[in-house]
Amino acid sequence: MKVGIIGAMEQEVALLRSQMNEPTTLQLGGCEFYQGKLAGKEVILTRSGIGKVAASVATSLLLEKFAPDCVINTGSAGGFAQDLHIGDMVIADEMRFHDVDVTAFGYEMGQMAQQPAAFPCDGKLIAVAQDCIAEQGKHQTKVGLICTGDQFMCKPDAIAKARADFPQMLAVEMEGAAIGQVCHMFKVPYLVVRAMSDIAGKEQVESFDAFIEVAGQHSAEMIIKMLGKL
């Protein structure tokens, strides 16, 4: 099995890259691709850059040039569930956009025109992730909705609107639904796994800066364990 792994930031891919066996490197379209072996699997590790457009470009290039059997998005997120803490994990069962609004044309809030309202994650990948979490037993883990948008959610009004629009949302980040949309269009199974670097409404900028490496490490450890079971 060939696995594509996408992280937006250096802190989200550094540990994974350090564990790869002599990866070959390709820089293309502002993205970096590292191809090699990790946990016994052929892996293409991708540093996409931040945001929906960067994630879409990276995912499209990854799928077109390397043809992985599945894609896993790793990294950090901001927690929205009241009982989540920094370092806790969220496994997405589906991804939605929180900053898309074409409801004037009869679409759901968050639904892009001519696209589904949500991009479901692959059930088999979810099950593998849950097994790994159960074995680790280190962090609280939830499975549910993660939403994506091109904004860092630190303003009270934006947080309140997101909660009202998506009351079931567990976490928010800036790439996952874009990756999900591209995988949907290419018909490739995918999964988003995120560790919490900050919690909505709780000194988020300072928290993110302090804990992004911790969140990246937790998420990377989870991915390595998953690879051993795929």
Curated annotation (Swiss-Prot):
Q: Which domain of life is it from?
A: Bacteria
Task: Name the active site residues.
Answer: E12 (proton acceptor), D198 (proton donor)
- What EC class is this? hydrolase
- UniProt GO MF annotations: adenosylhomocysteine nucleosidase activity; methylthioadenosine nucleosidase activity
Question: Carries keyword Hydrolase?
Answer: yes
The chemistry this enzyme catalyses reads: S-adenosyl-L-homocysteine + H2O = S-(5-deoxy-D-ribos-5-yl)-L-homocysteine + adenine; S-methyl-5'-thioadenosine + H2O = 5-(methylsulfanyl)-D-ribose + adenine; 5'-deoxyadenosine + H2O = 5-deoxy-D-ribose + adenine
Give TM segment ranges: none
**Which residues take part in binding substrate?**
G78, M153, M174, E175
Reported EC number(s) for this entry are 3.2.2.9
| GO cellular component annotations of the record | cytosol
The pathway where this protein functions is: Amino-acid biosynthesis; L-methionine biosynthesis via salvage pathway; S-methyl-5-thio-alpha-D-ribose 1-phosphate from S-methyl-5'-thioadenosine (hydrolase route): step 1/2
Keyword vocabulary terms for this entry: Amino-acid biosynthesis, Hydrolase, Methionine biosynthesis
Q: Which BP terms from GO are recorded?
A: L-methionine salvage from methylthioadenosine; L-methionine salvage from S-adenosylmethionine; nucleoside catabolic process
Q: What Gene3D superfamilies does its record include?
A: Nucleoside phosphorylase domain
Cross-referenced InterPro entries: MTA_SAH_Nsdase, Nucleoside_phosphorylase_d, Nucleoside_phosphorylase_sf
| Record's keyword annotation contains Hydrolase | yes
- Pfam family membership, one: PNP_UDP_1
UniProt xrefs under PANTHER family: 5'-METHYLTHIOADENOSINE/S-ADENOSYLHOMOCYSTEINE NUCLEOSIDASE, 5'-METHYLTHIOADENOSINE_S-ADENOSYLHOMOCYSTEINE NUCLEOSIDASE
Q: Tell me, what does this protein do in biology?
A: Catalyzes the irreversible cleavage of the glycosidic bond in both 5'-methylthioadenosine (MTA) and S-adenosylhomocysteine (SAH/AdoHcy) to adenine and the corresponding thioribose, 5'-methylthioribose and S-ribosylhomocysteine, respectively. Also cleaves 5'-deoxyadenosine, a toxic by-product of radical S-adenosylmethionine (SAM) enzymes, into 5-deoxyribose and adenine.
The family classification in the record reads: Belongs to the PNP/UDP phosphorylase family. MtnN subfamily.
Can you say what this protein is called?
A: 5'-methylthioadenosine/S-adenosylhomocysteine nucleosidase
Q: Which organism is it from?
A: Aeromonas salmonicida (strain A449)
Q: What is the lineage of its organism?
A: Bacteria, Pseudomonadati, Pseudomonadota, Gammaproteobacteria, Aeromonadales
